Amino acid sequence: MFKKLFRQDGNILNSELAEDLPIPRHVAIIMDGNGRWAKKRFLPRIAGHKEGMDVVKRVTRYANAIGIDVLTLYAFSTENWKRPTDEVDFLMKLPVEFFDSFVPELIEENVRVNVMGYRENLPEHTMRAVEKAIADTAHCTGLTLNFALNYGGRSEIITAAKEAMKELVSEGKTSEDLTEELLNDHLMSHGLGDPDLLIRTSGELRLSNFMLWQLAYSEFYFTETHWPDFSKEDFLQAIIEYQNRSRRFGGL
């Protein structure tokens, strides 16, 4: 089933993209609007999260189909613990259901799972599901499906700076020896590369403490569409918009 859909999506998506223009290597998405989607339909917020999980599967398929290397999804921030307990409990159960149902298909399509964030603070059942998904797909060499789970950009930078300084001190060096490259080596996203394109759904125009270091030169794409309604056409439009931009990285 997954292979059939994968091939269909690949044919449709690739036929719409400019062959002579690059696609983003790394796409990051702030998946926003689950609660508002549910409210519009007089449903509980968790219904929006449930629907959003299905969209994650579809968008993963789209990204894989067009040859994106890394797809990073902002799943749960360090600030999200402030939400109502019943909502947080549901969100912590979602990875278990998601990975149980989707990992076999990911393996079939050579997709590797990665999770960045403060995993040690996750509930035990969530941690087990995460670690199993990572282990089960460790041999895969295609798309990296990277989840930011219990993640905060500011905390990540502080943690990376502390680890970098420990390394320098152990080598008899000082803060004067700290470089961007060394700090980058200690970020949770090390080895994945910086996002080329950031997509945020639901019309909000902010980063919400997401990958603050890594997004320095990323292209941003904002859409009014709530995450549960985010379609193949929405994804394709974001990629086409990226293809039509000129990235200068501070130059001319």
Swiss-Prot record:
Which positions does UniProt annotate for substrate binding?
33-37, 45, 49, 77-79, 81, 83, 200, 206-208
Q: Does the keyword Transport apply?
A: no
Q: Which GO terms describe its cellular component?
A: cytosol
In terms of superkingdom, the source organism counts as Bacteria
Note whether Metal-binding occurs among the keywords: yes
Q: Which terms in the Gene Ontology molecular function aspect does this entry carry?
A: ditrans,polycis-undecaprenyl-diphosphate synthase [(2E,6E)-farnesyl-diphosphate specific] activity; magnesium ion binding; manganese ion binding
Please list the cofactors this protein needs: Mg(2+)
Record-linked NCBIfam families: PRK14830.1, uppS
Which protein family is it in? Belongs to the UPP synthase family.
Q: Which HAMAP family match?
A: ISPT
| This protein's name | Isoprenyl transferase
Native organism: Listeria innocua serovar 6a (strain ATCC BAA-680 / CLIP 11262)
